[in-house]
C-alpha cells in the first residue's frame, strides 16, 4: 500500500510538472521552429505568423509519464523480480495501473493528451542507479548494476524462455499506450531459422504485444568482410577490427562501442536464446 501510494504521489508530481512545462512551451515563437511550422508538422503551425506564440498548436502533442526499473523495484520489495514471482508481477501491474489513473485524471482536468510510456532510458538507466547508489548504498539486485532494467521488462539476466518472457510482459502493453516494446534476444545462429522466428512473431501477436522486436548480433570484419557472430577476433583473418551492430532497444544505433557504459553492461548481461 505504501509503495502504491508513493507511485500515485510521484505520478501526480510528474503530471503537474508536465503541465507547467507545457504552459511555458506555449509561449515559444513560431519562428523558433521553422521546419516544424513551415511543414505543418505540428497541426496548425503553418498558419502562424513567425512572431506568434505557438500556443494551442502544442495541444495535439503528448505529455508522457514514463517509468523504468520495475524489476528492480520488485526486488527491493520482495527479493525477486516479476519474471517468476506472481506476487511481484501483480504489484508491478497495479503500480502501472495507478500511473494510468493519474494520467486519466489529468486528461480530464486539463483536456490534454496525458499518456503512460514504458521508458527505454538509454541515458537515464545508468544515471539513476548512480544517484540511488549514493543515496541508499549498494543493494543486491537493485542498485548493484550499472543500469536499471527498462520499464516493465523482465530482468535481462533472467533465465526465462522466450515464450514466458513474452507472456509476462505482454499485459503491460495495453496499459502503456504512450509507447512500449518487448524484445527477445537471439544468438547468431537463430537468425538462420526462419520457422523459429515466425513462431516468435506468432506468439507476440497472440499475446497482444503492441511492438515486438527480435534482436540478434550482426558482426562484420572490417578487414576481410566476414559476417557472423565474432567474439574477439575474426575467425577468418584474426583481425580485431570488428563492427558489432546491436539493437539498443527498439532501433539500431551503430557500433556497440558508441553505446554508453550502462547500456553496454546491459547488452552484455542479456540472455541470448538459441
Question: Model-found features: residue ranges?
Answer:
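Long, C-terminal-biased catalytic regions of enzyme "large/alpha" subunits
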Residues: 1-274
Amino acid at each position: 500500500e505504501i509503495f502504491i501510494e508513493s507511485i500515485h504521489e510521484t505520478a501526480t508530481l510528474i503530471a503537474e510538472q508536465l503541465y507547467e512545462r507545457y504552459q511555458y512551451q506555449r509561449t515559444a515563437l513560431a519562428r523558433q521552429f521553422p521546419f516544424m511550422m513551415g511543414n505543418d508538422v505540428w497541426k496548425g503551425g503553418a498558419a502562424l505568423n513567425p512572431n506568434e506564440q505557438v500556443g494551442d498548436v502544442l495541444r495535439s502533442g503528448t505529455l508522457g509519464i514514463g517509468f523504468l526499473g520495475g524489476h528492480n523495484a520488485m526486488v527491493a520489495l520482495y527479493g525477486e523480480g516479476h519474471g517468476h514471482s506472481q506476487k511481484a508481477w501483480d504489484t508491478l501491474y497495479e503500480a502501472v495501473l495507478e500511473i494510468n489513473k493519474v494520467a486519466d485524471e489529468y486528461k480530464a482536468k486539463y483536456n490534454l493528451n496525458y499518456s503512460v510510456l514504458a521508458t527505454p532510458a538509454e541515458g537515464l538507466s545508468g544515471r539513476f542507479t548512480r544517484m540511488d547508489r549514493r543515496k541508499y548504498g549498494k543493494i543486491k539486485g537493485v542498485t548493484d548494476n550499472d543500469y536499471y532494467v527498462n520499464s516493465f521488462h523482465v530482468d535481462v539476466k533472467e533465465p526465462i524462455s522466450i515464450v514466458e518472457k513474452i507472456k509476462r510482459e505482454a499485459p503491460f502493453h495495453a496499459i502503456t499506450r504512450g509507447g512500449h516494446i518487448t524484445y527477445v534476444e537471439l544468438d547468431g545462429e537463430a537468425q538462420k531459422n526462419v520457422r523459429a522466428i515466425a513462431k516468435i512473431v506468432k506468439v507476440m501477436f497472440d499475446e497482444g504485444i503492441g511492438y515486438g522486436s527480435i534482436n540478434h548480433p550482426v558482426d562484420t570484419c572490417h578487414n576481410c568482410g566476414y559476417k557472423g557472430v565474432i567474439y574477439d577476433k575474426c575467425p577468418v583473418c584474426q583481425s580485431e577490427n570488428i563492427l558489432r551492430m546491436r539493437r539498443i532497444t527498439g532501433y539500431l544505433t551503430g557500433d556497440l562501442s558508441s553505446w554508453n557504459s550502462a547500456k553496454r553492461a546491459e547488452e552484455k548481461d542479456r540472455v541470448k536464446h538459441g
